[in-house]
Amino acid sequence: MRILLSNDDGILAKGLGVLERAAESLGELHVVAPDREQSATSHSLTLHHPLRPVRLGERRWQVDGTPTDCVMLACEALLEARPDFVLSGINHGPNMGEDVLYSGTVAAAMEGLALGIPAIALSFAGNVLRADALLDTQVGAIRSLLHHLTGLPAFPADTLLNVNLPAVPGDEIRGIRLTRLGRRVFSDSIARMKDPWGRDILWIGGGSVEWSGAPDSDFRAVHDGYISVTPLHLDLTHRDVLNTSTEWWQEP
């Protein structure tokens, strides 16, 4: 099996190295990843300047572009044949709830899906320091999870699986839960401050967070020490609203 690995934290990221170790027994690995941090780039493409892939090894490339660029170039230009699976991650931080709208990690997997390739996005639901400390202990659990997911007798069509790993040592992971996206609400997420010259600047990020603890949500699973697996797809149509259009829609 031919596996494409990418991420949004960059080619040198700890999480990518852990993913390589966990996935090496799946088959032939090809790594095509950004040459620098590309977090929160979502599904953006580089359209207004050329991209320069740099070959670092027999099956290893870095690209001066976004995670989506990396997957597109890998599948359309760099690999001799398309991969059987796209694996993206392991992100240094969670991708749950609304995170998936901004995540370059999820976007890389979504680009694989858009190209017709089964895909899995993986994220560590803790901060960078905890990722550095704990990811090595989770390699065995991640390896088992990947073998299970890629070996499913009927991997769901038109679907990527969004995986979040709890921030606990590998031997404390309690199991796996199939989940839905939860909801997270940020407050005071824009910090106002001054630059060294006294000018106003705004910084996005931080603030307090409230999350949905619904029993079937990704947040609840990870909070309880489980790996969450959430199926996502490209179709953003709100079908419940579409199916009840007679209740609210009026022809202009």
From Swiss-Prot:
Cofactor section: a divalent metal cation
Disulfide partners: none
Main location: cytoplasm
Compartments (UniProt record): Cytoplasm
Binding site for a divalent metal cation: D8, D9, S39, N91
GO molecular function: 3'-nucleotidase activity; 5'-nucleotidase activity; exopolyphosphatase activity; metal ion binding; nucleotide binding
EC number: 3.1.3.5
InterPro entries: SurE, SurE-like_Pase/nucleotidase, SurE-like_sf
Function noted in UniProt: Nucleotidase that shows phosphatase activity on nucleoside 5'-monophosphates.
Protein name: 5'-nucleotidase SurE
Naturally occurring in which organism (per UniProt): Gemmatimonas aurantiaca (strain DSM 14586 / JCM 11422 / NBRC 100505 / T-27)
